[in-house]
UniProtKB/Swiss-Prot annotation:
Light-harvesting photosynthetic bile pigment-protein from the phycobiliprotein complex. GO terms for cellular component: phycobilisome; plasma membrane-derived thylakoid membrane. This is Phycoerythrocyanin subunit beta. GO terms for biological process: photosynthesis. The keyword Iron does not apply. It comes from Nostoc sp. (strain PCC 7120 / SAG 25.82 / UTEX 2576). It is a peripheral membrane protein. InterPro entries: Globin-like_sf (IPR009050), Phycobilisome_asu/bsu (IPR012128), Phycobilisome_asu/bsu_sf (IPR038719). PANTHER family: C-PHYCOCYANIN BETA SUBUNIT, PHYCOBILISOME 32.1 KDA LINKER POLYPEPTIDE, PHYCOCYANIN-ASSOCIATED, ROD 2-RELATED. Keywords: Antenna complex, Bile pigment, Chromophore, Electron transport, Membrane, Photosynthesis, Phycobilisome, Thylakoid, Transport.
């Protein structure tokens, strides 16, 4: 996993160049944006339990057949694994927001996840629905302007949404 700074330096070094004015300006903007990132990550981390629990409850209400007798998530062990996995995905979304890069989520969370769910008989579209529910809650929390560093957060919210979309796409 490389953060944005490391990537820019690596690219310039590969070319044998100093950082360009545009690259320095882009990194300066990233530094200015970092407080907003920290605010959002802090909010999501502080609300992680409720984000995951509410997404799980909504998923059970939406798809009871999966959680009833004979369903892929019927046993307590499977239900606990579902909650755990939603928590893992949320955690890696927060890492991605903090780094400004989703590669850590791809490398350590999403690679092979679809195949795992297929092997377990868990419908990927159900997992994707749970991820969508977390996305909706996370965006609502991140969009609350109280206690967030002043400034336009629309690009950061779009980035946050893209990490959830990436995770949802990885499981179907």
């Amino acid at each position: 996993m490389l953060d944005a700074f490391s990537k820019v330096v690596e690219q310039a070094d590969r070319k044998g160049n100093y950082l360009s004015g545009d690259e320095i300006n882009a990194l300066s903007a990233l530094v200015a944006d970092s407080n907003k990132r920290l605010d959002i990550v802090n909010r999501l981390t502080s609300n992680a339990s409720s984000i995951v629990a509410n997404a799980y409850r909504a998923l059970v209400a939406e798809r009871p057949q999966i959680f009833n007798a004979g369903g892929a998530c019927f046993h307590n062990r499977n239900q606990a694994a579902c909650i755990r996995d939603l928590g893992f995905i949320l955690r890696y979304v927060t890492y991605s927001v903090l780094a400004g890069d989703g590669s850590v989520m791809d490398d350590r969370c999403l690679n092979g996840l679809r195949e795992t769910y297929q092997a377990l008989g868990t419908p990927g579209d159900a997992v994707a629905s749970g991820i969508q529910k977390m996305k909706d809650a996370a965006i609502a929390i991140a969009n609350d302007s109280k206690g967030i560093t002043k400034g336009d957060c629309s690009q950061l919210i779009a980035e946050l949404a893209s990490y959830f979309d990436r995770a949802a796409s990885a499981v179907v």
